[in-house]
Structures are given as C-alpha cells and as structure tokens.
Amino acid sequence: MAHKLWEKNFEVNKEIERFTVGRDRELDLYLAKYDVLGSMAHITMLESIGLLEKSELDQLLAELKQIYAIADKGEFVIEDGVEDVHSQVELMLTQKLGEMGKKIHSGRSRNDQVLVDLKLFTRHELKEIVDSVKILFDELIQKSNQYKDVLMPGYTHLQVAMPSSFGLWFGAYAEGLADDMLFLQAAYCMTNRNPLGSAAGY
C-alpha cells in the first residue's frame, strides 16, 4: 500500500483508520469538480502576486478545465496507489505539464484545500436545494390560489373547529417552506466564507 502523506513513523490501528478515512477516496469523487475550482482560484492568486508566470497560469488553467470537464461528466477516477482527489489532480497535471503541475500547492495547506472543497460542494448543494424548494413553493402558492374557494373544515386534533379552505391548507405548507428558506439562507452565508489559512498550525 502506498505511503500516505499524513502518515508518520508508527502503526495506525487498522480498524480506526478504516472507520475514519476508509471511504475517503469514494467520497472524494464528489469533490473533484470543487477541488479543481479551488485550484483555479488559488493559482490565479499565485500569478497575481508573482509566484507564477502568466504563461504557467494559462497552461495550468487549460489543463484544470480539462480535468473539470472529466469530473463534470462523472468520469473522474482516483487511480490505484493515489491517496486522494488532491493527489490525483496533481498527478494529472504533472503528467501533462511536468514539475509545473506541483505548483498548485504553493502556499496552501492540504487541510485548507479540503475545507475549500467541502465548502464549495456544500454551497452548490444548498443552491440546488433552494432552487428545488422555490419550485415547490411556487406550485403550492399556485394551488393555494386555485383552490381558495374550495371549503374544508379546520380541525383541532380530531374535532372540527373552524371553516377553512383547501387553498389555505396549501398556503400553510408554502409558508412553512418560506421559514425553511431562512435557515437555508443562513447556512449558505456560513458556508460562503473562505477558509484558507485556517487549517494549519493549530
């Protein structure tokens, strides 16, 4: 088995390792696109402060876009002996660009990189959820207006309590979703923060 980048000179309990990181490679496949996006932003910054030449940036961005396209089609694979998504992306770059490919890690902790990937992934998933909730909300509002004159009884537990309508029943669910959107918005704001520099040295 290949030596892991985080491994030190002592034996790790295999059961603990399996429980904590045993499925990392499988889960890393979901992060491939976001790892590439994080690297694209990082190398753009490196070029802006003079740590990469413009020609190097252009070549790295071109190759990263190719890797992104592979990941976007669901064809990204972490090869045997490669530890994780970060190492696989670097391997693909060095296969095409040689030592230049290793420059994507300049000034960046791998733990920082993990946090960036997770935040970008979570941000994308939250947006997908919000878009789906918006579609459902609009449908409920449409039904609420459509059936506003269709009467039905309102209940307290199992006892008829007040006159109501089918439209009001739909509207109640729509209002519940509006409250949920506030939580999703808060989650998005918390996720949409740059973690770079926070994951090393503590």
List PLM regions with ranges.
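A helix-coil-helix interface module used to build multimeric assemblies
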Residues: 1-202
